[in-house]
Amino acid sequence: MSSDTEMEVFGIAAPFLRKSEKERIEAQNQPFDAKTYCFVVDSKEEYAKGKIKSSQDGKVTVETEDNRTLVVKPEDVYAMNPPKFDRIEDMAMLTHLNEPAVLYNLKDRYTSWMIYTYSGLFCVTVNPYKWLPVYNPEVVEGYRGKKRQEAPPHIFSISDNAYQFMLTDRENQSILITGESGAGKTVNTKRVIQYFATIAATGDLAKKKDSKMKGTLEDQIISANPLLEAFGNAKTVRNDNSSRFGKFIRIHFGTTGKLASADIETYLLEKSRVTFQLKAERSYHIFYQILSNKKPELIELLLITTNPYDYPFISQGEILVASIDDAEELLATDSAIDILGFTPEEKSGLYKLTGAVMHYGNMKFKQKQREEQAEPDGTEVADKTAYLMGLNSSDLLKALCFPRVKVGNEYVTKGQTVDQVHHAVNALSKSVYEKLFLWMVTRINQQLDTKLPRQHFIGVLDIAGFEIFEYNSLEQLCINFTNEKLQQFFNHHMFVLEQEEYKKEGIEWTFIDFGMDLAACIELIEKPMGIFSILEEECMFPKATDTSFKNKLYDQHLGKSNNFQKPKVVKGRAEAHFSLIHYAGTVDYSVSGWLEKNKDPLNETVVGLYQKSSNRLLAHLYATFATADADSGKKKVAKKKGSSFQTVSALFRENLNKLMSNLRTTHPHFVRCIIPNETKTPGAMEHSLVLHQLRCNGVLEGIRICRKGFPNRILYGDFKQRYRVLNASAIPEGQFIDSKKACEKLLASIDIDHTQYKFGHTKVFFKAGLLGTLEEMRDDRLAKLITRTQAVCRGFLMRVEFQKMVQRRESIFCIQYNIRSFMNVKHWPWMKLFFKIKPLLKSAETEKEMATMKEEFQKTKDELAKSEAKRKELEEKLVTLVQEKNDLQLQVQAESENLLDAEERCDQLIKAKFQLEAKIKEVTERAEDEEEINAELTAKKRKLEDECSELKKDIDDLELTLAKVEKEKHATENKVKNLTEELSGLDETIAKLTREKKALQEAHQQALDDLQAEEDKVNSLNKTKSKLEQQVEDLESSLEQEKKLRVDLERNKRKLEGDLKLAQESILDLENDKQQLDERLKKKDFEYCQLQSKVEDEQTLGLQFQKKIKELQARIEELEEEIEAERATRAKTEKQRSDYARELEELSERLEEAGGVTSTQIELNKKREAEFLKLRRDLEEATLQHEAMVAALRKKHADSVAELGEQIDNLQRVKQKLEKEKSEFKLEIDDLSSSMESVSKSKANLEKICRTLEDQLSEARGKNEEIQRSLSELTTQKSRLQTEAGELSRQLEEKESIVSQLSRSKQAFTQQTEELKRQLEEENKAKNALAHALQSSRHDCDLLREQYEEEQEGKAELQRALSKANSEVAQWRTKYETDAIQRTEELEEAKKKLAQRLQDSEEQVEAVNAKCASLEKTKQRLQGEVEDLMVDVERANSLAAALDKKQRNFDKVLAEWKTKCEESQAELEASLKESRSLSTELFKLKNAYEEALDQLETVKRENKNLEQEIADLTEQIAENGKTIHELEKSRKQIELEKADIQLALEEAEAALEHEEAKILRIQLELTQVKSEIDRKIAEKDEEIEQLKRNYQRTVETMQSALDAEVRSRNEAIRLKKKMEGDLNEIEIQLSHANRQAAETLKHLRSVQGQLKDTQLHLDDALRGQEDLKEQLAIVERRANLLQAEVEELRATLEQTERARKLAEQELLDSNERVQLLHTQNTSLIHTKKKLETDLMQLQSEVEDASRDARNAEEKAKKAITDAAMMAEELKKEQDTSAHLERMKKNLEQTVKDLQHRLDEAEQLALKGGKKQIQKLETRIRELEFELEGEQKKNTESVKGLRKYERRVKELTYQSEEDRKNVLRLQDLVDKLQVKVKSYKRQAEEADEQANAHLTKFRKAQHELEEAEERADIAESQVNKLRAKTRDFTSSRMVVHESEE
């Protein structure tokens, strides 16, 4: 596996080739149990993943991933591979090789878009059905020169390996790409050619000198593909660009690895597609490209149209393909023809023959009257075809209809039937296209043959894979036989490689040729008396049939060959005649039509015309075709008689044998393409389909072969490292043992089957499955070891803990014992005397200790001076080292320049040598070629001379014959005509021979000239050769001298010896790439030399830097020792200071206890305290100086390290630059990269050292800072808490009052919400009532619609009854029956009525005129009825529409407000949750703060002895006052942020309440709208007034609430001021108390004589001070609470003020919106009413038409003569009626859409959605266009109705009314446009309001986020303070305990 950095070379394609290291590790660490995880056979998905639950009675219970339980047999359960094998790149390395493992590995990689996977020698690729960036130029460069194991699987890797094998092994290569149609074979073939054209491009050297060449060889190779695709690719069901032929592309390379030429061989072109396609397919692309009219000149040239349906051959399936642009593809095809050097004549012929094939499909023939013979049905198409083919049309038609057939020795004209002629035309079309395609391939090969010297080739085989269809014919047998041969070839090749691997590793192995497994099936097909042999034999017999062929197969093979079987009969499938067992499965074949397909007969008479065609291309295509006619005329053709009857199968076998012989001479590489699904869905994989292809492609066959051998192999070192844990005792510790022996001992000690593995020279080989067993054993072993280790660790930790508990217990006992003893003796008189005397005894000791401290302090100063002197010395040494470094750099640079000069001379000589050798080789080869050409020319010259002499003799003989003929001419007048014809023929022959003679003479002379020139060239080349040999000898001698010089240099610079060796090896490896790199090397030589010198300089610098680094490391260690010494000294000093402080405290205590101490002792104590303070200050100054010195040293050290780091970075950059040029030079990068890695390692070591030093220094600094911080924290906390106490107590009361007010307002809002809910329930009830009404109205509407449809039918019958009343009844009856048969089930009822009417009409023919008058009366009566019905329908429709609209509007509004209410409720809940969480956090902070205060008080009580020191530190407290003030500001800022958060919460609640108010208002508006529809507009106005009054009352209540808030705010301000005054008074009292305490302390010091009285006063003062402190703590806590409450109340007040302003603004907005909605609703209602009236008018017109129809029906029932006319006009007038019905429905739909859009506009006006308004505008424009279309349709219908105006005047009136309605609708649309514009303006205004609200919301959200951030910061600070307080408290407690 390559690292992620190595994958960066592939750019954006890296994730699609190999997953990152992190993803691979995560996948491998997934849980896995090898005993339960498995694959199981599944009926749904073939195989499914699952877990084994139980196994009993020969059945296994498995639970699948989708929680299904399956009970299967043990053989249906397959082992699953461990996670380390997931998405493995080579499936042959799977430890469990089985079908489901392969399937799921492919599937997992495919879902990750890794489409390429190795399977042993195979590369399996899955079609992704989408574009992936895995073919970009950077990917090509990434695979260039990489071995297979060095890069992820890819088609480029296969291609590059083939290319490298060709260069190194000097052996031809082949790449076999197979797969089903649509699997990606053609795309991968293109990528292979693209890769070779990129890496082996010839550039300018490959340009052909011939003027026909239009591009480089690479361009031509690439351009051949689009031309072949145009003529050989077509759309199929699976693939839009399916190759319908196989091809083998050979790309030839020269001696240097450059492209030299290429050629193409094709196989099995599907020529039947030319004349027949399935429905979902189409013919070859070239036909549709021509018809795309991208090149109009082709349309004119080929005499065709642009409509594909004019040509039956190409229009049987689909015409257009969505993924293909035929016009652009035509340009690409035409460009490819030009690039490939086709002449204009060839190009024209190519297009003409393609067009002729299209015309062939239009040729029509008919049967002669009273004969079975065919004759042409028109000659126009034949004329076009003949013109394009260069034939005579009459000859062509005659040859098709009356071909000449040879019977015996005579020719007979045979008449053809129409079917035979059509078959002949189809066969000729296919033959012309096939030969045209083959000629095109030959012509491409001629162009790609550049005559450049070529050495080896790489062949790319793109051929169809194994095919198993429901119907398999001869084509499938050929394809499957090809794959059978290829699979046999693969099996043999694969195991030969395996055998070589085993032989190289020294493993005993019996060779098994798996290629023999397929021999039986192959012999059955191709051997004598095989299937192909019998087929060809049957084709020789004229009376043979498909049945006789089948019988022969049965007789020969059924029961004798295991691979030949009789197929099973399956219902629903086509009949199959025999089955073959292939390696991929059993295939049923049908032999229908095999004999005809194999013979492939052609009309020889037409072929003869082709051979004489004036179209040179057509004549050339059939020039070698031997007809019977030609056979009788020429002797030479008789030799080729057999070839004229060459069958399709024989030709196929010949090509296949040629292909296999080519492949056997190559080293093959296999690519198998897989189609993942049938629907072309990216990322989806159908298991059954993929498994079928894996079997057909031989992938599973390859895995079967792998399982026979040892598929898993591991290097000995890797195996020992990974599996040593299985039995570590088997490998002895402490002594060297070879890895192979260690693996042998390890495997021998494990309980496994020892026949399942073998030991090679470098690897250990395993059978399939054994490696998985070892993995399971390793996992179990690791689990046991980890469990044991955990147990040992837990035991050790518990023992340590127990020891601590025991020690703690003993210490407690000791302390208790000492305390009890002390309590017993402390009241003894002698003990009291001891307490008084002992302090006096220690004074002398104290003086001694002070003296020792002074001495130590002096020593510390001396050591500091010494360290400073050492530092200066080190700085001087550093300067000298830098100077030495610069000198060494100059020296190294000079040496490296000299070395580079020598290397350059050496490289130039080596290059010159290789160039000269290559030139000598080329000259030698050219000389040999010239000699061969010279010999050939000499032979040709002799042959030409012989032919010339023979021609001369022939000419003499012909001249004699001519003289004789002239004499006989005068004598024989009867034969004059024949002789004249013979004479003219002879004249032409003489002229022809004369021309040939002249041409031969010219050729002879040219050959002589060429021979002389070639001889001169040979002589000059020989001279040049001798000169070059001399130069080579000179260069070799100079090379020897240079080698000696190089050896001398290598002795001086041994380090560079490896570099030169690698350079020489890389030069030898790059011989083949030398010509390509010559020009680039010239440009890069100078730059490379500079870089090389720089690199060598940097190497030497790196060595120097390493030395300096070591020195600096030593110096750093010394400094560390000094620092440690300083730390120890400082710790000792600190300890002494603490001891002195403790002793001082003890002295003070004892002084207090011993009240009778003299003033001299007090003065002595003061003096000692002063000295102690002085010593402490001196110590602190020394500490500061020491820290400054350490910081300076660290800075200098950091500077030097940074300088070294910069230099190392420079080296790193140079390394990276050289790595980029690695692919261009490949010379000395390996050694350079190793040196750079060493430098980078040294840099990393330096960085680690620097980091450790910095950590140590930071720790020391941190300790110092903590000591200083601990001294000042208590004082800062005291002053801060005193200032906070007063203000917080006042704020508490203000907050409580505000909270009570807010609770009252909240209750009011809750009541309003309940009222809204009640109103919503009432609306739901009203909605249900409307729904019932709507349902009943819809039912009525349906009834009326059915009546309307009946009236429409009557109208149609009327129109039919009024046409052609005087026709004969019998004729119309027959027509009526014919029409009735064609009608559908809808007319069954009409047919019965018409039959009855026809019978009535036959009886009452004479009474027609009398009943016409009655029809008129009936018509008038029906018109009245229709009008009445129309009025009812209009009413019902209007009522239904109104109810429907009400229901829709109410549902929409209700749904919208429900969603809004739910969203608001969710927001409210979220806000409440957030508020509760914030309050809990606040409460926690308060509790924590109170705990901190309690701890502080305990600390103060416990440390009362430090009061004297606190008094001395008052000055420091004053200095820190500023810091306290800043902290106070930050606290206030945090509290403000907290208030902002609370404000945001309140704003959210206010927004919720505002939304609820909106809901109330909108519901009221809805109520108004409904009442407005049901009642009058006046009532609606009153409701709006009522709504205004309600809003006014709401405003008044809000105003009163606002006034209350203002009053409460004033009250809160007053309370705040009062509490601030109280706080100031408390602070004054506290300051007085502090001053009194200070005065008391001073008084204590001044009074000496009255010590006892002063002591009593002092104790009283101290107790009073402690009481004051306790009171102060209580006040501080209360002040904090009050402060928080004040801030909350202040925020609440500000929020209330803002809410009031917002409510006022929203009230104004809502009033304006109500007015606006009112006006909009009024206008919309008017518009709706207008639309309803228009709709009713349209319906009335339709009802008029229906009345007319009913009148006409009455007339028709009474009119007998009109029945016949009605039958004739039935179909036409029903179409007209249907059109009118569609028109009516369209109009109704248009009106409904307009109503719907108006409703949406209403809603949009409420919502203010600008985008919806725009959509509405676009929709109205569409409606305008639809109305215009409907206008046109209506005018057309009016025109149609005018035809019947003469007979039905009523319909004229209706058409006029229709036009009026259309005009009214147009006016209505114009009005709607005006309305829409007004809506648009309103929407824009609403949008502006929405934007304003949105900005407010964003601002509030931003403030909330900032407040949260500030709260987090404050919380972190509080936590830090709390932690520091705890630390300080604990330290004080420890000190106190130690003092006691």
Curated annotation (Swiss-Prot):
Keywords: Actin-binding, ATP-binding, Calmodulin-binding, Coiled coil, Cytoplasm, Disease variant, Methylation, Motor protein, Muscle protein, Myosin, Nucleotide-binding, Thick filament. ATP binds at G179, E180, S181, G182, A183, G184, K185, T186. Gene3D superfamilies: 1.10.10.820, 1.20.5.340, 1.20.5.370, 1.20.5.4820, 1.20.58.530, 6.10.250.2420, Kinesin motor domain, Myosin S1 fragment, N-terminal. Residues 86-779 form the Myosin motor domain. Residues 840-1933 form a coiled coil. Changing D517Y: In DA2B3; uncertain significance. It is found in: Cytoplasm, Myofibril. One of its GO terms (biological process) is muscle organ development. Expressed in fetal bone, thymus, placenta, heart, brain, and liver. It comes from the Eukaryota. Residues 33-82 form the Myosin N-terminal SH3-like domain. Changing L1344P: In CPSFS1A; uncertain significance. The keyword Flavoprotein does not apply. The modification N6,N6,N6-trimethyllysine is found at K130. Residues 782-811 form the IQ domain. GO terms for cellular component: cytoplasm; cytosol; extracellular exosome; muscle myosin complex; myosin filament; myosin II complex; sarcomere. Its main location: cytoplasm. Disulfide bonds: none annotated. Residues 656-678, 758-772 are annotated as: Actin-binding. Muscle myosin is a hexameric protein that consists of 2 heavy chain subunits (MHC), 2 alkali light chain subunits (MLC) and 2 regulatory light chain subunits (MLC-2). Muscle contraction. Belongs to the TRAFAC class myosin-kinesin ATPase superfamily. Myosin family. It is linked to Arthrogryposis, distal, 2A: A form of distal arthrogryposis, a disease characterized by congenital joint contractures that mainly involve two or more distal parts of the limbs, in the absence of a primary neurological or muscle disease. DA2A is characterized by contractures of the hands and feet, oropharyngeal abnormalities, scoliosis, and a distinctive face that includes a very small oral orifice, puckered lips, and a H-shaped dimple of the chin. The rodlike tail sequence is highly repetitive, showing cycles of a 28-residue repeat pattern composed of 4 heptapeptides, characteristic for alpha-helical coiled coils. Limited proteolysis of myosin heavy chain produces 1 light meromyosin (LMM) and 1 heavy meromyosin (HMM). HMM can be further cleaved into 2 globular subfragments (S1) and 1 rod-shaped subfragment (S2). This is Myosin-3.
